[in-house]
């Protein structure tokens, strides 16, 4: 494994002085700031295309996320990057990366545990009584997969009789980067703490190397979930066959009332 040693302090100071000397301070772009006009354009674009409302109070959050995109690109500042990505010159990859950078990916295992209790105690018995072959569930804002895998654990535990129906889960998100994490199903051990011990023993496999503080959802459970990109603001989105259970609370909370009604 490569190691990268920090530059000595004096060396860093010399490099910093040289870099500053190349461009007068008055003309150096403010990489980490966004103009009010561009913030308004960004907020409007994100709300129109993803449904997520971005109030003015989020400006520093937006700057922090966009500055990473600027550093990974050829642009000198956030404003220059915004001018490009919100222009006709932007390609599909540009817009995908832009949306990936700005979407919120807050998620946990067993987030809102009362919802999963209700699924287990009320919904599942009702669906089992209907004698259907497959119970279909949808995690509508899957993020890195924790909600979908929680669903899978609850369903696997509640449908463990040979006479019970099978289940299938569709897990979607607009962010393609977090979907890649979700497909791998690998998580830090700390993130798995909310999972009950019995479920961890049954559905989670720790890394062979104890120095790696992570674990992976077992393959039979991963196989029950199909991950895919989906934008809830697309009026023609398709999830295939009708769903029996839909988890969408954790995305609707970021939408305005009118957008919530439109999605539902």
Model-derived features: positions:
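A short glycine-rich, Lys/Arg-flanked "PGG" loop and its adjoining helix->strand segment in the class I
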Residues: 261-264
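Conserved AdoMet
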Residues: 2-138
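Short, thiol/selenol-centered motifs that function as redox-active sites or metal-ligating centers
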Residues: 32, 142-148, 251, 255
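Extended basic-aromatic, gly/pro-enriched interface segments that bind polyanionic ligands
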Residues: 140, 161-247, 251-259
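Short, well-ordered alpha-helices that flank and scaffold nucleotide-derived cofactor binding pockets
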Residues: 121, 125, 153-157, 184
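Conserved class I S-adenosyl-L-methionine
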Residues: 132-150, 170
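Conserved SAM-binding loop of SAM-dependent methyltransferases across substrates and taxa
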Residues: 144-162
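Alpha-helical elements of the RecA-like P-loop NTPase motor core of helicases
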Residues: 117, 149, 180
């Amino acid at each position: 494994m490569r190691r990268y040693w920090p530059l000595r302090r004096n060396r860093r100071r010399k490099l910093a002085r040289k870099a500053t000397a190349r461009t007068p301070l008055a003309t150096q772009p403010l990489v980490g700031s966004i103009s009010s006009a561009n913030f308004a354009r960004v907020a409007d674009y994100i709300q129109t295309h993803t449904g997520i409302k971005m109030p003015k109070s989020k400006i520093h959050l937006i700057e922090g996320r966009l500055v990473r995109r600027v550093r990974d690109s050829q642009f000198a500042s956030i404003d220059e990057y915004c001018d490009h990505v919100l222009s006709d010159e932007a390609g599909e990859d540009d817009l995908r990366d832009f949306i990936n950078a700005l979407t919120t990916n807050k998620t946990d295992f067993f987030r809102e545990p009362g919802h999963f209790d209700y699924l287990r105690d009320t919904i599942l018995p009702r669906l089992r009584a209907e004698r259907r072959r497959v119970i279909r569930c949808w995690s509508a804002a899957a993020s890195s997969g924790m909600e979908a895998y929680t669903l899978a654990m609850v369903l696997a535990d509640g449908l463990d009789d040979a006479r019970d129906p099978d289940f299938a889960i569709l897990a979607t998100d607009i962010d393609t980067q977090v979907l890649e994490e979700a497909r791998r199903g690998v998580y830090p051990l700390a993130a798995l703490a909310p999972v009950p011990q019995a479920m961890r023993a049954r559905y989670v496999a720790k890394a062979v190397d104890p120095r790696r503080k992570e674990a992976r959802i077992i393959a039979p459970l991963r196989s029950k979930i199909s991950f895919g990109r989906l934008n809830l603001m697309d009026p023609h989105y398709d999830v295939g066959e009708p769903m029996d259970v839909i988890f969408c609370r954790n995305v609707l909370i970021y939408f305005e009332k009118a957008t919530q009604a439109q999605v539902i």
